[in-house]
Structure formats: structure tokens, C-alpha cells
Amino acid sequence: PLPFILSRTYSSYRTKTPAPVGSLGPGWKMPADIRLQLRDNTLILTDNGGRSLYFEHLFPGEDGYSRSESLWLVRGGVAKLDEGHRLAALWQALPEELRLSPHRYLATNSPQGPWWLLGWCERVPEADEVLPAPLPPYRVLTGLVDRFGRTQTFHREAAGEFSGEITGVTDGAGRHFRLVLTTQAQRAEEARQQAISGGTEPSAFPDTLPGYTEYGRDNGIRLSAVWLTHDPEYPENLPAAPLVRYGWTPRGELAAVYDRSNTQVRSFTYDDKYRGRMVAHRHTGRPEIRYRYDSDGRVTEQLNPAGLSYTYQYEKDRIT
């Protein structure tokens, strides 16, 4: 029933209309990073692969379809879709409140669902802010609904240094997960304290990061760990350690992944000059896979010392 699955994908592709860098760092995306930009006559959906999908402006109840990605984008505002519409039955699985809201957008890649709900983060207004505040010119993922009406909810902070960021998830089985976030300053201080306790010289770890990368604006907030904090089936048997933990470079790049036994299972290396451009990755116990890029930032070689290696050539209408 809509279990919470924290997957991640990496792409060195840089769109001209990027969404902000997510909590996994530049180049990385997870499903929760889906974001819709509302322009004057265009809607730009940034998917969890970092690509930009363009749709025409939609009136309430209208839908757009991306043939390349087999994805529908529908604007709320109607109780029912036309009976002949492929999504008519799936639309009725949504709560009436969502169907009737013209300010919400919904996306799906199958008539079987699920729906990705694109809304906005409720936040605490500033003391001198004129109310009601206008809605932001973008929409973020607030939850999922499957064809049986079961939901998965993303909880975003309403105030503070993590305002707008996902800090909790409730899945379709009622389990609650806590996402621990850190700022660049917090990671820098932790690195200094570890160096002091270990009796070593602290390495260069800046307190701030540049506000922009080739992959979009970057607020420096990163995901540190994911905890299971509530399970209705086993309320007294919660794990005493995080389900997953992440390590970061001083430049805010994802460096390592640790499982629930605190064993490192993945490692990543990046270009010294281009922040976020991965040049190598490795599964623990396996050979390191390396990448080479051309001057345009495109992968030209994939080098595997223990298996097949690949070279890529870019032509006008194909890659060989």
C-alpha cells in the first residue's frame, strides 16, 4: 500500500531551466524532487532525472501529455474528467478536495496510477507580511495517491532553516519516516569536531557553498539520514539506527552511502573543477567505474577495469 521507497538517480545532464539542487546534492535526484515551474504561457516539469518537460498553459480540468516520457499533467478544478478520458477512473480515486482545487496539479505516467500531487508548502508568514500571501510560482511534490485512494504524504517544514524541505514521510501503511537534514555550516562544524577528537588537523571544509551550480540554485541543505520513527504493525520494535546514512564532500557532493548496519555500500568521486560532475563510483567490494567527459560536459568514456568499457560519440540525432 504505497510503501516509502527512497530511490535516487544521477545524471550529468544540465537542463537550461533547472529546478533547485535537491537534498542529495548536485546531479542527484529522488522522486520527491519533482517540481513544476509556472511560467506565463508555459509549465516546466522537472522530473526525478533532472530533465525539463514542457507543457502549454492549462486551464482548470485540462491536461497535457508528454509523448517522449508517456506522462500526463492535469490541472485540478473539475469533479470529473470526460468519460472517455484514459484517466477518468483514476481521477475519481482522488479526494474531492484535490480534484476541485484549480491551484493543484497532478501528474501520472499510467492510467493505473499513482498520482503525484503537486502543491505548495504551508508556511508560517513573516510578521510584516501582507495576508493572504500569493501562492508561489512553482509546485512541489506533496504526496502520492494510488488507484485505490491510498495515500503517501510528504511533510515539509513550515518555518526555520529547513522551511519548505521534506523532513518526514507517512506511507500508505501508516509508517512514519524522519528525514534528518543538515546545513553546510553544520557539516563543517561536525568535520572540525571529528578532526579534534581524532587528534588530526581539520581539513578545508567551508561553512558556506556557492549559491548556484550548473545543476541549479543550491541552498546547501543535504539529507543526512533516514529513520523509521513509527510502525503501526510493530510499534515497540523500531530500529535503533537509521535505515540509511549519507556522507558528503566539503563541496556538498554525495560521497558515500551507509546501510542500517553502518556499513559503507557506495562511494562517489567528482571532478575537482566542476562541482557535481561524477567521475567515478563504486559498490563496496567491486571495481571502481570511471568516466571521462568532453569539453561540453558529455560522457565520452566509461571505464571498467574488470569488465566491458564503453566509448560514446555524439551525432546530431543519435548517440553511438
Report the location of each language-model feature.
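Predominantly extracellular/luminal regions of secreted and cell-surface proteins
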Residues: 1-10
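Short helix-loop capping/hinge segments that flank enzyme active sites or metal/cofactor-binding pockets
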Residues: 32
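Short, polar loop/linker segments at the starts of domains and inter-domain junctions
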Residues: 3, 15-29
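Extended charged/polar low-complexity repeat regions
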Residues: 26, 42-320
